[in-house]
Each structure stands twice: as structure tokens, then as C-alpha cells.
């Protein structure tokens, strides 16, 4: 999927009408008192790491739309989705007011999309980091050329409520989980539906409630993991849509399912569960649990090949913490963030962790 114009211009696109807007540098704002407290409260318990440096701030700033009818009460738009580029220090964040922002390594930011519908998922492509796939709460799936902000193509899902999105490693397939209990797999080149996993009627046949997390196994292109509000984790062979593993476990209410090697993570909305770790070779009970005392809304493994670090974020205690599956306690992070943490992602090298919160700020951890 190649864009017509591959130059790195600064054109920003709102719907289909490109306009020229200067890139905004957001390095100037100073930390608020709350953010200063967060920085000084950040804890590193992991001496094996040479450094863990917390930096906040990529504060939400809207250079174009001063008046937002969706943002009643004057609150900052919330960050619901984050994706970090494979081989560059570029981060995409999706907001509750429909904006998508791109941040580069120089801490510049530009707006590339404004849909006025909440962005619930987005992914920068693995094979071409100039393309981003996003989905809105009303089912608009869009492929965007990041440097220019131009839409490459889009399609709309009708009569269903999407909750989550993931891309295959080759970026040729999009998987979407729905509030109605369905999972749909689309061809990303033709924007056509290829596979449909219907709502289950029993434990053995699928989900019976909202699906909030679906993820392709990046080491096995035929495998998919899903989790939902029905407290079920399911493993799927997408070649024949066969359910090859199932367990009653975490109550998944956000993007809290991930897989790495034989290990499967499930972050739970129930504070007593925290984050549960499973081994797919004996997929019956969790092999370990990690206490958080919070409602977990995001959970991801580090993408570095030779470690098994993961991070989780949520609310109640408004935390973001990172864990090593071989250690008992968290290794770095903090409680008492200014607002709930709804989304996070690691860079491919595992040296950057970005997480987004309900106050519109994108926080960064250099590892």
C-alpha cells in the first residue's frame, strides 16, 4: 500500500481537506506541580537497568480547534490509544475528541487527523512506518500517510460497536473486536472482510460479552488471542477459526491482552486479580499473578527480544508500573498519577515506554 506522495511535508489533513498548519513544538511548556511530583515520585527498583528516566511532558495542545463541542466542561481530551514506530522515535496518540497526534524525536507534534469521533485504536505499520491504521468508536477504519496526513483509504463498519484493533506483523490483516462479542478479520489491502468469529453460545464456542482486546501473535501469523468482559481468554487458529485454547481468567475491559513466546498476559478490571500470566503449554490456570490494586486498562509486553518485561496501567490508584515476569514486585513505575492511565506501548528496542492518560498528557519513560 503506497501513498501517491511520499514526501515529508507538513500538510495536515482534517477529514478530506488538507490545510497547512505549522508544526508545533511542545518542548516549551514547563511541568505543572502535579507532574513535578510525579517525576520525583517515580521509583526504579531494578538495578540491572543502567537508567530509567521519567519525562513528562507531551501535554495536549490543540493548535487548530479551539472550540470542541464534544469536550463539554473544558476537560482535556483523553488518550485512548498509543503506538510507537518500529525503528524511529515517533509516537502516535489517539484522543477522545477524534484527533491523532504524531510526536517525533525532537518533541515536535502535528495533527494528522480530526474525525470528531473517539479514536479507540491505532497502529503504526511494521513494514512501512509512514502508514498508520486507526479506528474510531463509530467504526471508521482509516489508513493514513503519516508525513502528509493524507488518507490513503478507509472503510466503515456498520451496525456494530468496535472496541479494539490490531495489525498482523505483515500489516496485511486488521483484526477488530466488538462489543457484540464478534471478532472480524479484514484484508488491509482490499478493505474486505475475510474472517468472522461469531458471538459464542457457550464457553467452548467464543465470547459472550464485549471484546476489549485482540492481538495477533507476532511469532505465529495464524494465531490470535482475545479477551473480554466475560472474563475469558481465548486462543484462535485463524486458518479455520478454531478455538485452540480457553480459560476463565481476567475480566478484560481495555487493551490488556498480549502474547510473547509461550506467555500470555491478561490485565483485569478486578483489582484483586491484577495482571495474570499464563503459559500456553498448560493453559488452565495462571502461572503467576501481579498485584496492582487497580482497574487495569492497558497491559503490554516489552518488544525487546531477550527480556520479559511488561507494563500495566489503570485507575483507582492511577498507576503505571512495569514488571519482570521473573521478579515478584514491580521494577519501576509509580502510583498516584494525576489521572488514569488508559494506553501504553513500548518501542521495538524496548528502550522507550510511552503511556497516555485521561488528562491528555503523553508521558515517556526512557529505559
PLM features: what roles do these ranges have?
Residues 1-90, 94-101, 264:
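Intrinsically disordered, low-complexity acidic/Ser/Thr/Pro-rich linker and tail segments
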Residues 76-84, 116-125, 160-167, 202-217, ...:
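Canonical WD40 repeat/beta-propeller blade segments in eukaryotic WD-repeat proteins
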Residues 87-89, 129-130, 170-172, 219-222, ...:
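Short coil/turn segments that connect the beta-strands within blades of beta-propeller domains
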Residues 343-367:
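Blade-level signature of beta-propeller repeat domains, shared across WD40, Kelch, NHL, RCC1
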Amino acid at each position: 500500500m503506497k501513498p501517491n506522495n511520499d514526501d515529508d511535508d507538513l500538510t495536515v489533513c482534517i477529514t478530506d481537506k488538507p490545510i497547512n498548519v505549522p508544526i508545533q513544538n511542545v518542548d516549551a511548556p514547563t511541568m505543572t506541580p502535579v507532574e513535578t511530583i510525579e517525576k520525583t515520585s517515580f521509583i526504579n527498583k531494578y538495578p540491572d537497568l543502567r537508567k530509567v528516566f521519567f519525562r513528562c511532558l507531551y501535554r495536549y495542545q490543540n493548535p487548530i480547534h479551539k472550540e470542541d463541542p464534544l469536550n463539554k466542561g473544558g476537560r482535556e481530551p483523553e488518550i485512548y490509544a498509543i503506538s510507537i514506530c518500529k525503528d524511529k522515535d515517533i509516537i502516535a496518540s489517539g484522543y477522545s475528541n477524534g484527533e491523532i497526534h504524531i510526536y517525533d524525536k525532537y518533541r515536535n507534534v502535528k495533527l494528522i487527523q480530526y474525525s470528531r469521533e473517539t479514536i479507540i485504536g491505532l497502529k503504526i505499520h511494521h513494514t512501512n512506518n509512514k502508514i498508520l491504521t486507526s479506528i474510531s468508536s463509530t467504526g471508521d477504519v482509516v489508513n493514513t500517510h503519516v508525513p502528509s496526513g493524507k488518507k490513503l483509504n478507509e472503510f466503515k463498519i456498520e451496525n456494530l460497536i468496535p472496541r479494539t484493533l490490531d495489525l498482523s506483523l505483515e500489516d496485511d490483516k486488521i483484526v477488530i473486536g466488538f462489543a457484540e462479542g464478534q471478532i472480524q478479520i479484514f484484508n488491509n489491502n482490499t478493505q474486505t472482510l475475510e474472517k468472522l468469529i461469531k458471538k459464542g453460545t457457550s464457553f467452548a464456542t467464543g465470547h459472550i460479552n464485549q471484546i476489549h482486546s485482540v492481538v495477533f501473535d507476532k511469532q505465529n501469523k495464524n494465531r490470535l488471542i482475545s479477551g473480554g468482559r466475560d472474563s475469558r481468554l481465548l486462543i484462535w487458529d485463524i486458518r479455520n477459526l478454531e478455538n485452540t485454547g480457553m480459560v476463565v481468567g481476567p475480566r478484560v475491559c481495555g487493551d490488556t491482552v498480549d502474547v510473547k513466546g509461550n506467555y500470555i498476559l491478561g490485565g483485569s478490571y478486578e483489582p484483586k486479580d491484577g495482571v495474570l500470566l499464563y503459559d500456553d503449554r498448560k493453559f488452565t490456570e495462571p502461572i503467576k499473578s501481579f498485584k496492582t490494586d487497580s482497574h487495569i486498562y492497558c497491559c503490554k509486553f516489552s518488544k525487546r527480544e531477550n527480556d520479559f518485561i511488561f507494563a500495566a496501567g489503570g485507575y483507582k490508584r492511577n498507576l503505571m508500573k512495569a514488571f519482570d515476569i521473573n521478579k515478584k514486585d514491580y521494577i519501576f513505575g509509580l502510583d498516584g498519577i494525576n489521572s488514569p492511565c488508559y494506553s501504553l506501548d513500548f518501542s521495538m528496542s524496548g528502550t522507550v515506554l510511552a503511556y497516555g492518560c485521561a488528562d491528555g498528557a503523553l508521558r515517556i519513560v526512557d529505559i
